[in-house]
A protein has these predicted regions:
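Generic beta-sheet signal
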Residues: 9-13, 103-112, 133-135, 180-181
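Short, well-ordered alpha-helical microsegments
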Residues: 21, 116-120, 192
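The conserved 3'-phosphoadenosine-5'-phosphosulfate
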Residues: 40-47, 137-147, 176-227
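Conserved phosphate-donor/acceptor-positioning beta-strand/loop module used by diverse small-molecule
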Residues: 111-115, 129-149, 164
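Short glycine/proline- and charge-enriched loop/turn segments
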Residues: 150-158
Length: 227
């Protein structure tokens, strides 16, 4: 049983790896939401940065392995069910780590594609803390995502598409019936302010003010012709 929302709103960015979740999170972070304390740095695959909690990503990886799965499992959805005692152990670890990463934030912004697969547990954790859960789902075509995974991880295109399907099925199914909005990667690159405004209207938040600052770098798009 979850608590009635009293603490604020928690924003969860869901979706597949290489589908624009980092760019979307950067845009949302300009709207008064709070990033975690220990943000994963950028690298040669994502120079602008990942905008996600490094410790939470590590925990989610371990959690998936405990379920007999992994972030790159083409058949991760639906996850194997853990015994109640095991599930409670992982939930407690995640809840404590969330507090370490976000402190007293009333508008935490949690992004890790793995959360898409673990969403039911994360929803329960956040609602137990008194947050209203708001889902923002990043979408990008499977061919483009598979091409990006082929380049970064050496996966076959077929495997990349299957992983994409697993994540997107999980993100859609688990967020169904909740307050959510889908943001297409192409639309975000074309006009991030327009998409940010649409997110704000969905959640009843103030729309972003017009500034000269660009939250999304269009030049970071990869494999543009694959979609």
């Amino acid at each position: 049983m979850t608590s009635a929302p009293t603490k604020g709103a928690a924003y969860l960015v869901l979706g597949m790896h290489r589908s624009g979740t980092s760019a979307l999170t950067k845009a949302l972070s300009s709207l008064g939401t709070d990033l975690p304390a220990h943000v994963m740095p950028g690298d040669e695959h994502n120079e602008a940065g990942y905008y996600e909690s490094w410790p939470i990503a590590v925990l989610n990886d371990q959690w998936l392995r405990a379920c007999g799965s992994a972030w790159d499992d083409p058949f991760a959805y639906p996850l194997n069910t853990l015994a109640p005692a095991q599930e409670a152990e992982w939930t407690t670890k995640a809840a404590e780590l969330f507090d370490e990463e976000f402190g007293d934030s009333r508008r935490p912004l949690l992004k890790d594609p793995r959360v898409s697969l673990l969403a039911p547990a994360w929803f329960d954790i956040l609602e137990a803390k008194g947050f209203e859960v708001r889902c923002v789902i990043s979408s990008r075509g499977p061919a483009a995502v598979a091409k990006s995974l082929e380049r970064r991880n050496g996966f076959s295109l077929q495997r990349g598409v299957l992983i994409w399907a697993s994540y997107m099925l999980a993100a859609e199914r688990y967020s169904r019936g909740r307050t959510r909005v889908f943001v297409a990667y192409e639309a975000l690159l074309e006009d991030w302010r327009r998409e940010a405004g649409r997110v704000c209207r969905t959640f009843g938040d103030p729309e972003p003010e017009a500034t000269g600052e660009e939250a999304v770098d269009r030049s970071l798009r990869h494999h543009a012709g694959a979609e």
